[in-house]
Regions:
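Short alpha-helical segments that sit at the start of domains
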Residues: 1-19, 108
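Short amphipathic alpha-helical interaction segments
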Residues: 35-52, 61
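Short acidic, hydrophobic short linear motifs in intrinsically disordered regions
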Residues: 24-38
């Protein structure tokens, strides 16, 4: 596996963790922004998903929710999403979502540093 795909797979894993957390309302806003020790990559993933309009921030708990585009994205990749949630075919699932996320265009500009 080449290094760039390996890095994309790592980022993809964090993106999927963020998508899962958004659905389960299980994290604080600090976790999403990477303010929790050792979770800087989660902040990068949160920004990547926001820039693709798959999640949006909101006031109050939960700090993020799926957008209609995010819901459609997960529905379009339902089989792979279910495989991710059940931890089956982990590598194949991550490759699937790495390619799917790369094909999803960014619609928001980079946010200024917080």
């Amino acid at each position: 596996m080449d290094q760039s795909l390996e890095m994309d797979i790592g980022k993809t894993l964090h993106c999927l963790e963020v998508l899962h957390a958004v659905q389960t309302d299980s994290r604080t806003s600090g976790w999403y922004w990477g303010d929790v020790r050792g979770k800087a990559a989660v902040g990068v993933a949160t920004t990547a998903l926001w820039r693709r309009d798959l999640i949006c921030s909101r006031v109050g708990p939960p700090p993020f929710r799926l957008t209609p585009k995010g819901e459609a994205f997960l529905k379009a990749h339902k089989k792979a999403w279910e495989a991710f949630l059940t931890n089956t075919d982990r590598h194949e699932t991550l490759e699937h979502f790495a390619h799917a996320l790369q094909k999803t265009p960014e619609v928001h500009e980079v946010r200024a540093a917080r």
